[in-house]
């Protein structure tokens, strides 16, 4: 079943805010929260993430009917990519390699911002590229 495109974009906006605060404060705890949010989105789809729940319960009822839908697989893959970057960032911050924490968190922030501000999902594009490459290889 396809999903409302506004949900992942809302999640990207919240993620952008959270990751910006992580970079400003260097908070490993807040990055751990974001890592968990990515993990839930990767495991169960964006609707199962905390931000998906917020969108579904607080935001979507106040919006009009969705006019655009997308397959859930690309955003789910994007959550897994975000999980990888957040996990590396979390390792960096907790092991004292702050440069690694900042670099990985900054990369995740850039991707989230692109989705939130412009509707361009880097992880989704990666998913489509991987699909094209694997279909050709078969």
Segments (PLM) and residue ranges:
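Membrane-interfacial helix-loop segments of redox and metal-homeostasis proteins
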Residues: 1-138
